[in-house]
Amino acid sequence: RFFRECGVKGVFYNADTEGFGVEQIRYQLLAELNWRPDMTDEEYEALMCELLEKEYGEGWDCVRDYITMWTKAQDTRRTNACWHAIGGNKAMWDNRIDPYYYDTHSGEMISLVEEAIRLASSELQQKRAEMLSCHIYYTTVYTRYYRAEAAGDTALVNTLEGYYATAMDRLRRLGY
């Protein structure tokens, strides 16, 4: 609605439609918004939930809960830089999402995606959830590893290395 009020006629969403997160869902939602720019927040939410259910089956609500948490982690970051591209950051891992949010919530995020994997009723749903899990494990490692290493927290470093190994094992098994 904001873009339309500014005179924008459409949006070219330059992003992958596949991948390890929820890109296909985001892409479909934006396409729907191009055709239905007056969609209410409630209609948008209902459409997102419908798309998530198609992609993830019974575990769709776990993925929706994760998206809420992921959004919060982006909304609470302490800087507006994008992957250090415009500078001004002390720590590269501190600029896309709030790493301190991940300190207290990554365990729940991982539990949510593992539950979505468990609830998958088809091979495709399981693959989608496992691909999403790689994103979640990697983001957890990315946001926490360097600070844990700098603090000498070997227990956390070992846990994070296990997360990384899990993600890499899944990627290999999925053919990546």
Outline where the language-model segments fall.
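Short acidic/histidine-rich active-site segments
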Residues: 11-18
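Short, low-complexity, polar/charged sequence segments that are solvent-exposed and flexible
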Residues: 1, 31-33
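Catalytic domains of carbohydrate-active enzymes that cleave complex glycans
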Residues: 6-8, 33-176
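Histidine/acidic-residue-rich catalytic or RNA/ligand-binding cores of hydrolases
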Residues: 21-30
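Catalytic-core region of carbohydrate-active enzymes that cleave or remodel glycosidic bonds
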Residues: 1-11
